[in-house]
Swiss-Prot record:
Entry keywords, A to Z: Chaperone, Disease variant, Mitochondrion, Phosphoprotein, Primary mitochondrial disease
Family designation: Belongs to the complex I LYR family.
Gene Ontology BP, a term: mitochondrial respiratory chain complex III assembly
Compartment annotation: Mitochondrion matrix
Protein name: Complex III assembly factor LYRM7
GO (cellular component) term, any one: mitochondrial matrix
Disease: Mitochondrial complex III deficiency, nuclear type 8: A form of mitochondrial complex III deficiency, a disorder of the mitochondrial respiratory chain resulting in a highly variable phenotype depending on which tissues are affected. Clinical features include mitochondrial encephalopathy, psychomotor retardation, ataxia, severe failure to thrive, liver dysfunction, renal tubulopathy, muscle weakness and exercise intolerance.
Gene of this entry: LYRM7
Length: 104
């Protein structure tokens, strides 16, 4: 797959993730859209393979971070915030056991 195709694929993936993560939040959606477009536009003329790979790594890390770490909060009252987790954020709740397992 060509480098231009990979860059375009990352660009589209970042925008899809932005739409999922900031759903129903017009201000955050717009700010993220502007930032993504700005970063890609600023590095549009980059020709160094090493620098392009580095930027691609940063972009994919940002996408992963957005998808797995950001949670939406909605103000319901004066001092109340309702959290709206996505399925990507929900993990199986396994109890932690610090004691070593005993051999039988």
């Amino acid at each position: 797959m060509g480098r231009a195709v990979k860059v375009l694929q990352l660009f589209k993936t970042l925008h899809r993730t932005r739409q999922q993560v900031f759903k129903n939040d017009a201000r955050a959606l717009e700010a993220a859209r502007i930032k993504i477009n700005e970063e890609f536009k600023n590095n549009k003329s980059e020709t160094s393979s090493k620098k392009i790979e580095e930027l691609m790594k940063i972009g994919s890390d940002v996408e992963l971070l957005l998808r797995t770490s950001v949670i939406q909060g909605i103000h319901t009252d004066h001092n109340t915030l309702k959290l709206v987790p996505r399925k990507d954020l929900l993990v199986e709740n396994v109890p932690y056991c610090d004691a070593p397992t005993q051999k039988q």
